[in-house]
Amino acid sequence: MTPREIASQAAHAIAVLNELTHGGGELSNSTDVRAIVRSLELIGQGLPQLCEQLARFLVIQHEDGQLTNADGLDPDDSVTEVIEALAAAGQAADMMTAALTEARAASQVLSPARTRGWESRQEAD
């Protein structure tokens, strides 16, 4: 598979997760939430490196004269803009990952409640 195909699959996986979890959909309990958050955390950990590698590729392509601007202008400004945006995306991914780590850690104390029988519910009322 190509990097492009894998990126498309990753985007599709997030879209499917959004569909499956809409309104609680396919979620069973807090353990499901914690597992999904952990997976998102792992994705987030890899995004800064990926953004850096994409930027590095564009720099090399530009230095080798392999990039042109569709408007016929010098591609310097466009390449710089893409590189800066990718750097910002990498930083945002770091922040997202930190928040996901915090969410996962905070969720450790949550567990599914025991189902109480009808008698226990009446006593609680």
Residue ranges and their predicted role:
Residues 1-111:
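Hydrophobic alpha-helical segments that drive targeting, anchoring, or assembly
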Residues 106-125:
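Short, charged, intrinsically disordered terminal tails
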